[in-house]
Amino acid sequence: MLSSAYFLPKDKTTEKEIGTMAKAQDRKEIVSRIGDAAKLYRDRLVGKRFMYVFDGRYIEVIYKAENFRHLTGVETFLSAKRFYSYAARKILTAAQIGFNAKHPYDLCVRKVEHIGEVATMAGSESFLLEEIKTDTQSYKFGTTDLNFTLCMNKELDDQGNEKGDCFVVQSLRDEDCFSRSKEAYSVTHIFSRANDKKKYTDLLFLDKNADMNNLPQEVKKLLDDCLLPQGREND
């Protein structure tokens, strides 16, 4: 007599196949998150200039479209500009990205989440790190909210000379990087302006122990009159 179990349909899906399906679903989910992060990056960061005031000094910072791919931490055969364009337009596909030992999935998930938090960090308490050294790269400055760090350098021309007067965000580290930096400072002010404006028009952050009166003169010269205390424009 045959056992009734003999007639039961067998599930032919192997553990390997289940794992493959899960990985495919993971890729679809991260593609969606990358698209959301790209939209925030485009709407709130690209096309703007940010000024961080710290230690009686300041630096100006920009975000470039071609750096978005590296910030996400994913593996892809797409060029940096095409990857960003596809992500921002929500046409990036799961087949166009991948993960490996150098670009692990879990780290990518955290990095993409951090990109979505960058705009918030630009308007909240943060620290400015100077002379950051990682295992593979050195950066002049970085900014951190204690959860992650944005590392930045000035771009170089073909002769190795610095280009422009702004630092460009080039890397996102899933750590605060205090131990990797030479010095750390509290940021007292953060300003922003559109690239087509000559002066800074928006105050994004003001430390509770700082005010607009004690800014360095060179910073005041970069601010629109609407941000300056009355009667102190020419102090």
Listing of model-derived features with the role each one plays in the protein:
Residues 1-137, 142, 192-235:
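An acidic, glycine-rich, mixed-charge low-complexity segment common to nucleic-acid enzymes
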Residues 145, 149-158, 162-210:
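Compact beta-sheet-dominated globular domain cores
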